[in-house]
C-alpha cells in the first residue's frame, strides 16, 4: 500500500489565528479563559486547550463576571456582542476575518433595508452568527437556504431588492448550483463578485478531488462537527472513492484497506498535522509505504492578532 497526501491540507490561516488567540490569552492573563463555543471544530485541539485552562461554554450566561471571554472562529451574532458589552466582559474576537467579511456584507444589506439570502447549513454556529448580523427593523429580512429545493419554495417580499451571501465552508459544487437556482428564480439578485467560500475551503476541495482521482480510498482527518471536513469526505465519495472521516488513527479499521493499493490522506482546516502523522504511522505499521505529497496550491496567507495580545506577548 502506498500513501499519498493532499496538498494543501489541515490548518488554515483563520484556524491558526483562533487557536493562537486562546494560547496567547492563556499565556498573558493565565487561566481560566472562557471560550464561547469550541474555538474550532476539532476534538484534539479543544481537549488540548481545555487541559491548559480554557473553559468552553455555549452561551454567555455560563460565563462569570470579570473574566476574559473569546468568541470562536465561527463568529457570533450582534445580540451576543451586545450581551457581552452590557456585562462589561473583556472580549477577544477569534472570528475568522473571512467570516467577518460576510458579516459586514449582511450588515450593509440590513442597513439598506435589502432582503438577504444566506446559503448555509441550518444550526451551524457560523450560520447562526451570520444570520444574527441582520437587523430586520429597517424593513428587510434574511432567509436561509440549503439547496435548490429551498430556493424553489422561498417567498420573498421584494425580488427586485435581493442579495445573497454564503457560509464560508460549503461545497463549491453544491453552492454553485444553489446560486444558479437563485439567479434563475430571482434575476435581479445581487451578491459578491464570487461566492463567499474561503480560499482554504476551495483549495482543500480541489486537492481532495485530485487525491480521490489517484487513490483507492481516502481518509479525511477531522471531527464529525467540522463542516469543511464533512464536505471533503462527501467530495471524495462523489468521485466513487470510499472515504472515511476520522478524528485520528484510533478511528481506523484495518479492514478498510484490504485489497487497497493507494491510500489518500487529507485533513480539514481545523485538524492539526500531528493527527495526520499519527495516521501515517499507524498505516505504516499495517504495511503501507511512503507518504508522497501531491503537488498543490501554496498558501501563505496570515491574519493579524488582536493588538493587546500582540503587544503584551513581546514585553
Swiss-Prot record:
The keyword DNA-binding does not apply. Isopentenyl diphosphate binds at residues 41, 74, 124, 226-228, 270. It catalyses: isopentenyl diphosphate + 2 oxidized [2Fe-2S]-[ferredoxin] + H2O = (2E)-4-hydroxy-3-methylbut-2-enyl diphosphate + 2 reduced [2Fe-2S]-[ferredoxin] + 2 H(+); dimethylallyl diphosphate + 2 oxidized [2Fe-2S]-[ferredoxin] + H2O = (2E)-4-hydroxy-3-methylbut-2-enyl diphosphate + 2 reduced [2Fe-2S]-[ferredoxin] + 2 H(+). It is an enzyme of class 1 (oxidoreductase). Binds 1 [4Fe-4S] cluster per subunit. GO terms for biological process: dimethylallyl diphosphate biosynthetic process; isopentenyl diphosphate biosynthetic process, methylerythritol 4-phosphate pathway; terpenoid biosynthetic process. Pathway: Isoprenoid biosynthesis; dimethylallyl diphosphate biosynthesis; dimethylallyl diphosphate from (2E)-4-hydroxy-3-methylbutenyl diphosphate: step 1/1; Isoprenoid biosynthesis; isopentenyl diphosphate biosynthesis via DXP pathway; isopentenyl diphosphate from 1-deoxy-D-xylulose 5-phosphate: step 6/6. This is 4-hydroxy-3-methylbut-2-enyl diphosphate reductase. It comes from Pseudomonas savastanoi pv. phaseolicola (strain 1448A / Race 6). The lineage of its organism: Bacteria, Pseudomonadati, Pseudomonadota, Gammaproteobacteria, Pseudomonadales. The gene is ispH.
